[in-house]
Amino acid sequence: YKRQVNDDKSFLDDFEVGDIQTSSFDVTWQPVWGEEKDIRNQYNEMAVTLVQKEKNRRMLIRFRLFNDGLGFRYEFPMQKDLRHFIVKEECTQFAMTGDHTAYWIPGDYCTQEYGYTKSKMSEIRGLMNKAVDHQNIASKVIGEAAVQTALMLKTDDGLYINLHEAALLDYPCMHLELDSENRTFQSHLTPDAVGFKGTLQAPGVSPWRTIIVGTEAKDILASRITLNLNEPCKIQDTSWIRPTKFVGVWWEMIAGGGSWDYTSDYPTIKIGETDYTKAKPHGNHRANSQNVKRYIDFAAKNGFDAVLVEGWNIGWEDWVSNRKEFNFDYVTPYPDFDVKELNEYAHSKNVKLIMHHETGSAYRNYERHMDEAFQFMKQYGYDAVKTGYVGPIVPLGEYHYSQPMVNHFQYVVEKAAKYRIMVDGHEAVRPTGICRTYPNLIGNESARGNEFMSRVPLGHTTILPFTRLIGGPMDFTPGIFELDLSKINPNRHEKMKATITNQLALYVTMYSPLQMVADYPENYERFPDAFQFIKDVAVDWDKSVYLEAEPYEYLTIARKEKGSSNWFVGGTTGAQPHIAAFQFDFLDPGKKYMATVYADAADTDYENNQQAYTIRKMAVSYTHLRAPR
């Protein structure tokens, strides 16, 4: 850390230890939603006060040691010679003992939507160009040897290590830059528009830097260090925060060729001036009342909680990549979308509508309209919003993961909480456990999900739980049954690298309290027996057991439905076949259970026979060994 004004003395050296305080902590707490109903937070703490002799400045480093790793952060007490200061760079280093295997994506100031590369640390620099397999309109790749967190590592002798951060608040997002010669990762903070790596004020703290360690890969998945390093819930009444299973007007546009916009008449749009009542509809706008009612009926028939509708509001004809700030007002619907009628229709069927606020990354415009937009939601009965930040930040110069944008994303979550609104953040900074403090942050994207279709690599969903999901749940949008996308859009000649039962398993392995049932209703109606699993699977859990795992190879997880005796087990693999082997000792002894087993058929093939599956029932018990096949 380095001050900016009239002070060339860094916070790197010339320190002596002024004080050391130790303590212990052990408490069990209950999350509003989660992978288990009880989480134990047990650690030993050491707070080391360092005094810089020349300037007589103090900095405290606080360490918390857990059974499965540690967290540490920097703290800056109030003092005479340190009040406001600029961070030029944080120089935290993680020194490795060998050339470990790394599971990584390129460092980027604006996106995490990459496929993962598995390589030795020493190979990262040489593989970087190949690893940059997706540069969207907002991408800003950092350099030849920078990677993102959470970073998963494996030593040659089989130790698993995870590097990340927790409680990212009022601070830029951290990347890691590799010094290959010294086998050391150094923190690399996302700069703001003028190049600063942070503007801090004493008293203040950095986010926690986390190291999770396990002798088995599944130990990493079971760790709750990230959540435990965040503050307890700050929302007094959480009764309105509900895990949600939903359908949506979304896949029709993402994969099917439908449109978010309403007309082709206007080459440019001015909100408040463009008269849509005089426009001729182009006929491909999917967020129309008739189509939305179809999804509402489908949700009601199958017991789903809500319907997401994207493209309902004016402005989509001219919304991104034009350096345009006033692109949406978040309250004016297109002429073919009746807000009042649709919400009344949905509520009459015990279904909610989920609001969509795409910002086009014009974040200041969103902040100006946020109160009005949230009031509009409450007026019509919306209690959840999916936000989006596609494209470069407007005004230009900021990055998605800079301190100002981290603060913006947090502002949205806290403002939404005041209106009792749940948030599903897309294109936002990757999670760091903030959902413990603000559990209305019920979903995040922040990684490559199903919307990438054929560009979701084999094994991708076996590495995401070790990386992206370490910080919080992901809105991966599973449940695609028609995996040959040319069948829904003749112009799209691609197949997803998946099978129907693979898509079912993701509801268990890719944890989220907000799960989308993403495909067309008619594609589920073609496979009612497989669809039954999606109807049955829970979205909130009493207990999770990580049965077996190896990044990029396989993953098997068992979860017990909250408030029920039902268990769900999901398993996925990478490119190589895998026979799951585990015990059912997570079941209650003395009880017999009936298992409904959904599995790929013997001739299932993700390239040529994606929709073949088998379903059978069999009895299992506490002593049952191996997965039923």
Q: Predicted segment positions?
A:
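Carbohydrate-binding surface patches
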Residues: P551-P589
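N-terminal accessory beta-strand-rich subdomains and adjacent acidic, glycine-rich linkers
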Residues: K2-Q236, T604-D605
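Catalytic domains of carbohydrate-active enzymes, especially glycoside hydrolases
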Residues: N291-E310
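Aromatic- and carboxylate-enriched substrate-binding clefts and catalytic-loop regions
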Residues: E310-T499
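Catalytic cores of secreted or luminal carbohydrate-active enzymes
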Residues: L506-D542
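An acidic-aromatic substrate-binding cleft motif
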Residues: G204-V292
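Conserved small/polar residues in nucleotide/adenosyl-binding loops
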Residues: Y1, T623-P628
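Solvent-exposed beta-strand/loop surfaces of large extracellular or lumenal domains
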Residues: K37, P106-Q112, V597-S621
